[in-house]
C-alpha cells in the first residue's frame, strides 16, 4: 500500500511539472572547442526557442571543461543553463525529456533504464550507425521519437526504424542574414567541407582566368556566426560543394542575403533545391560556371528576375517564425502525450489503491 501511495505521489508531481512546464528538457551536445559547427547551433536554436517560450531547458555536456558556444555564436545563448554528465548529479525524471544526437548513439545503453521522453536527433543520417551497436534499434533503449531536418532523412528513418514517430524541423536561417545596402564586392564566398576542394577550385580558377586574379575568394568555413553573416552579404556570389550534407544551410543563407549560389548537387539532394541557383552534378564544371558568372557580373549582367523570385520562394518555409512555431508544436505534442500516459498510469494505480482499501474494509466487516 505504501508503495502505491509513493508511486501516486511521484506521478502527481510529474503531472504538475508537465502542466506547469517545469519539467526539464535536456539537449546532449558535444564540445566543439570553439570551432563553429552548424549541427551544434541547430541544437542551441531548438533549446533557446523552447526556453523563450517558458520551458525549463538545459544543455547537457560531458564535463566541466565544456567550452560553450559564446566564442562563435555570441552572447545570445548565454541564458541556457549547462549541466554536465560527469560533474553534476543529473537526475532525469519521468516527466523530463532528453534529446540525443545521432553521433551519441553510444550512450543509449546507459539511458535504457531511465523512464522519460526520449528523442533521437538526426541531422546526418550517415552517422546513424557509426556508434549504434550492431543490430540495435533505437526503440531497444526506449527512443521512439525522432527529429530530423529533411523529407529524405525522414523517409530513410521510417524505412529502417518504422516503429518511431519522425518529425521534421529544418534549421533556422537566422535574421542576421540580410541583404547588403551597398554594392557587392568582387569577392566570392566559398564553402566546401573538404578544404582540398576549395583549394582546387580557387587554384584552377586563377589558372584558367589569369586576368581575374584580382578577384578574391573568401573561405567561409569556421567563421564566428556574426562575422559569417556580415562577410557573406558583401560577396557577389557564393560557391558550395558538400557531398555529405543532408540539409545544407549555406546556400539558403546566401539566398537570404540576396546573392546567387553556384554549387554541386550533393548525393542527398536537399528538399529546397530547385531552379534557385546555378547547379551542376559535375564538380569539374564548377570553375567554368564561376568564371562565366564573374565575367557577366563585371559587365553589369545580373541574374534574371525568375531566379531571384525562386530564391525568395525557397526561403518561405524556412522563416524564423515558421520554424520556431514548428519546434514549439512538436515539443508540445511530446508533452501532451506524456501527460496522457501519466494520467492513465495514475488512474490505474488509484484504482488499485482504492481496491486494496475496499478489500481491507470488507475484511474488517467479516472479522
Give the residues covered by each predicted segment.
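Short acidic alpha-helix that forms the nucleotide-activated donor recognition element
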Residues: 90-93, 224-235, 256
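Conserved catalytic-core segment of nucleotide-activated headgroup transferases in glycan assembly
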Residues: 39-42, 155-228
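Acidic donor-binding loop of glycosyltransferase active sites
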Residues: 233-246
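A charged, aromatic-enriched C-terminal amphipathic alpha-helix characteristic of glycosyltransferases
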Residues: 284-288, 298-358
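N-terminal pre-catalytic "stem/leader" segment of glycosyltransferase-like enzymes
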Residues: 1-94, 229, 262-269, 276-283, ...
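Catalytic binding pocket for nucleotide-activated donors in carbohydrate/polymer assembly enzymes
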Residues: 243-315
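Extended catalytic core of nucleotide-activated donor transferases of GT-like folds
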Residues: 5, 10-13, 66-142
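A short, active-site helix/loop in glycosyltransferases that binds the activated sugar's phosphate group
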Residues: 108-109, 129-132, 143-164, 200-201
